[in-house]
Amino acid sequence: MATKFKIKKGDQVMVIAGDDKGKTGEVLQVLPKKEAVIVAGCKMAKKAIKPSEQNKEGGFANAEMPIHISNVKKVEA
């Protein structure tokens, strides 16, 4: 049975655990199978980008990583 989340895309949330504790941001994506959310500006990680036809150089880019749903709480905007 699928878990129903009270947090939806576009909600303002605060991180309550981890390195980004206390930060607030907008939910960009909800990942029900992983029971996680992606929050704008929180839990940033460097991702390697392979060279391709469009991007000959490749390189690195910052990207938001998922945060478990139990580590965020909804706040009023």
UniProtKB/Swiss-Prot annotation:
Pfam family of the protein (one) = KOW
One of its GO biological process terms is: translation
Which superkingdom, per the lineage? Bacteria
Q: What GO molecular function annotations does the UniProt record carry, in alphabetical order?
A: rRNA binding; structural constituent of ribosome
PROSITE patterns attached to this UniProt entry: RIBOSOMAL_L24
Cellular component GO terms, alphabetically?
A: ribonucleoprotein complex; ribosome
Tell me the keywords, alphabetical order: Ribonucleoprotein, Ribosomal protein, RNA-binding, rRNA-binding
The UniProt family comment states: Belongs to the universal ribosomal protein uL24 family.
Spell out the subunit comment.
Part of the 50S ribosomal subunit.
Known function? One of two assembly initiator proteins, it binds directly to the 5'-end of the 23S rRNA, where it nucleates assembly of the 50S subunit.
Q: What is this protein called?
A: Large ribosomal subunit protein uL24
Query: Which organism was this protein described from?
Result: Sulfurovum sp. (strain NBC37-1)
